[in-house]
Regions:
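Short, function-defining helix-loop hinge/capping sites that tune catalysis or transport
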Residues: 20-22, 42, 115, 141, ...
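Active-site-proximal helix-loop-helix substrate-binding element of RNase H-like nuclease domains
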Residues: 50-53, 60-63, 134-170
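Acidic, Mg2+-coordinating catalytic module of metal-dependent nucleases/exonucleases
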Residues: 99-109, 114-120, 147-196
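A short alpha->loop->secondary-structure connector
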Residues: 120-131
Length: 196
């Protein structure tokens, strides 16, 4: 009998930009799903305080994005990065995840992982080294299944971290039902567990 697969830890971050040299995290949201993409609990969405100088360093596009989403007005009342990391780790432990077992999931999540590795080392160590990146599946669908790609659900997250995660989960559910169709293999039982 196959063992139960670890949960997925979905993370989305909003930053002042994409540069690890100068930009900072200003929002992080986390949701946990089981391996069937069912959301476990309510998730957590945290705004992180940035200095006026850090906000002044944002380019026009990022400034407009965070203004339109309403995030810009919440940042001055945000919490510290350390407080955010503590809250996230407590949420993950309460959600039934175990250190080093659950992959990070999201859209273009390598960017988020770089900021997490820089600013939240305990969270980075808590995550499995593997990643489920929905944007990779989207790129493959665009090349190999364009009809499915163009019929994908529209995003509604409005560049807020929790909404973006919810969009990513819905997008992966869509690709799962449209592309990842279960094949029956005659005369073979799947192995109980694969080690790789």
């Amino acid at each position: 009998m196959a063992t139960e697969l670890p949960h997925l830890i979905w993370i989305d971050c909003e930053m002042t930009g994409l540069s690890l040299e100068k930009d900072v995290l200003v929002e992080i949201a986390v949701l946990v799903t089981d391996s069937e993409l069912n959301v476990i609990g309510d998730g957590i969405d945290l705004v992180i305080k940035a200095t006026p100088e850090q906000l002044a360093g944002m380019n026009e596009f990022v400034t407009q994005m965070h203004t339109a989403s309403g995030l810009i007005t919440e940042i001055p009342n945000g919490i510290t990065t350390e407080e955010a990391e503590d809250a996230i780790l407590a949420y993950l432990q309460a959600s039934g995840t175990q250190p080093g077992k659950s992959p990070l999931a999201g859209n273009s999540v390598s960017v988020d992982r770089n900021f997490i590795a820089r600013d939240m080392s305990r969270l980075n160590e808590y995550l499995h080294y593997r990643t489920v990146d929905v944007s990779s599946i989207k790129e493959l669908a665009r090349r190999w299944y364009p009809k499915i790609y163009f019929a994908a659900p529209a995003k509604t997250g409005n560049h807020r971290a929790l909404g973006d995660i919810q969009d990513s989960i819905e997008e992966l559910k869509y690709y799962r039902s449209s592309i990842f169709i279960e094949a029956q293999i005659q005369g073979q039982n799947p192995p109980a567990e694969k080690v790789d």
